[in-house]
């Protein structure tokens, strides 16, 4: 095995181990924020959604800056410092008893994510061959699902048996371990293959108008995805009346991922373009969300959640691969960072807007309101994507170094 192939293989295993700590730490805390503050403490869904949206907006909105620094300084210092910063954010969240403290914790967690997220994503693109990206993203999705179950089960148990403070401290410990692991084992990889200055990397992205429009359009996709952390857990708790039942959302995701993600991804790679897979998955997600406000049966809710995850299984590997192949190796992290802007906008609107619509629907006794609004947003997103792919010649190209 030549040295380059060996580096790629070892790098792949490193990414999988690192991802395990990060995902478990994330899911041990974030899905329970809405439950703790809305259901247990009685805060409004809008207020909690605003804090979650603020975290999303800062982390992903500043992604292009974090990515540009990673292009210039390398992956390791950005990833390690970002993981430690999120550790501190979770410690502060364990002390949050006012909206101000919650927002401060979310901001610090977001800044940590701004530092570690773009270079981690760029490492995947650097270490995995372009034609293998789709399958590797499928493996990561499968791992995400399994680790999400571990995280949410751990967090739910700690919340039931002890308190939210211990939930946050457990998440902090996991991110601290991830930071130490990266400091110890992550080589000093250079992500970018050119010597562009910080501003030149950002300018290169901003001159690619088609990439910018595509990125902004994906905000609609993330508005729907954000509900996994906000309204789906709340709806599950409303119908079941049991805090412990929230984990079934993520158990459903894990089971479907184990059974379907590899065969669906392999089969769709043979017969469908990336663009078609992205739009088809989004349509399935829309169909699943539409009736959620009307169901009052736990089994019906789980069926709709299952359909939502099937749509995600179809769309997400295609979206990740398409976004990766639209980047330029000369400013890889800058492209990845800017692409996170769609997650920033979509997450902010999905959390704060979803929380506001939930409160409004409850006030008007019209519980279907947020779900109908989500369906409309998703439909508009599909139509805009179709127009771009059909008429604006947005096509992936296999940039490589």
Curated annotation (Swiss-Prot):
Record keyword Transport present: yes
Keyword annotations: Cell inner membrane, Cell membrane, Membrane, Transmembrane, Transmembrane helix, Transport
MF (Gene Ontology): transmembrane transporter activity
Gene3D superfamilies named among the record's database cross-references: MFS general substrate transporter like domains (1.20.1250.20)
Transmembrane segments: 13-33, 34-54, 88-108, 139-159, 164-184, 211-231, 248-268, 275-295, 298-318, 341-361, 366-386
A Pfam short name: MFS_1
Entry keyword DNA-binding: no
Entry GO CC: plasma membrane
SUPFAM superfamilies xrefs: MFS general substrate transporter
Disulphides: none
Cell compartments where the protein resides: Cell inner membrane
Top-level lineage group: Bacteria
Membrane topology: Multi-pass membrane protein
PANTHER family, alphabetized: MULTIDRUG RESISTANCE PROTEIN MDTH, RESISTANCE PROTEIN MDTM, PUTATIVE-RELATED-RELATED
Record-linked HAMAP family: MFS_MdtH
Sequence similarity: Belongs to the major facilitator superfamily. DHA1 family. MdtH (TC 2.A.1.2.21) subfamily.
Name used for this protein in its record: Multidrug resistance protein MdtH
Gene name as annotated: mdtH
């Amino acid at each position: 095995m030549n040295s380059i192939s060996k580096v790629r293989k070892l790098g792949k295993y490193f990414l999988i181990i690192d991802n395990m700590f990060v995902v478990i730490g994330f899911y041990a805390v974030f899905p329970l924020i809405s439950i703790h503050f809305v259901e247990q403490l009685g805060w409004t869904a809008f207020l909690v959604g605003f804090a979650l949206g603020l975290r999303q907006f800062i982390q992903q909105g500043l992604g292009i800056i974090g990515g540009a620094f990673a292009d210039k300084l390398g992956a390791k210092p950005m990833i390690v410092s970002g993981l430690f910063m999120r550790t501190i954010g979770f410690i502060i969240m364990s002390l949050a008893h006012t909206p101000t403290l919650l927002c401060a914790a979310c901001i610090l967690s977001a800044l940590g994510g701004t530092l570690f997220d773009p270079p981690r994503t760029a490492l995947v693109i650097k270490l995995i061959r372009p034609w293998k990206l789709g399958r590797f993203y499928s493996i990561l999705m499968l791992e995400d699902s399994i680790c999400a179950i571990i995280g949410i089960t751990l967090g739910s148990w700690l919340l039931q048996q002890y308190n939210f403070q211990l939930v946050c401290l457990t998440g902090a410990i996991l991110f601290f371990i991830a930071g130490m692991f990266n400091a110890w084992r992550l080589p000093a990889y250079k992500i970018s293959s050119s010597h562009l200055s910080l501003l030149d990397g950002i300018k290169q992205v901003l001159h690619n108008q088609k990439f910018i429009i595509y990125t902004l359009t994906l905000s609609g996709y993330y508005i729907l995805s954000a509900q996994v952390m906000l309204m789906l857990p709340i709806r599950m708790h409303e119908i079941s009346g049991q805090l412990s039942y929230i984990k079934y959302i993520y158990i459903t995701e894990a089971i479907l991922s184990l059974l379907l993600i590899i065969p669906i991804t392999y089969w769709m790679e043979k017969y469908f373009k990336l663009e078609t897979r992205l739009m088809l998955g989004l349509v399935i997600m829309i169909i699943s969300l539409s009736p959620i406000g009307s169901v009052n049966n736990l089994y019906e809710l789980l069926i709709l959640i299952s359909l939502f995850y099937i749509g995600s299984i179809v769309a997400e590997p295609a979206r990740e691969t398409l976004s990766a192949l639209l980047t330029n190796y000369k400013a890889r992290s800058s492209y990845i960072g800017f692409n996170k802007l769609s997650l920033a906008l979509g997450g902010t609107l999905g959390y704060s807007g979803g929380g506001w619509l939930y409160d409004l629907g409850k006030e008007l006794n019209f519980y279907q309101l947020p779900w109908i609004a989500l369906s409309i947003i998703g439909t508009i997103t599909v139509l805009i994507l179709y127009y771009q792919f059909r008429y604006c010649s947005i096509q992936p190209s296999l940039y490589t170094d």
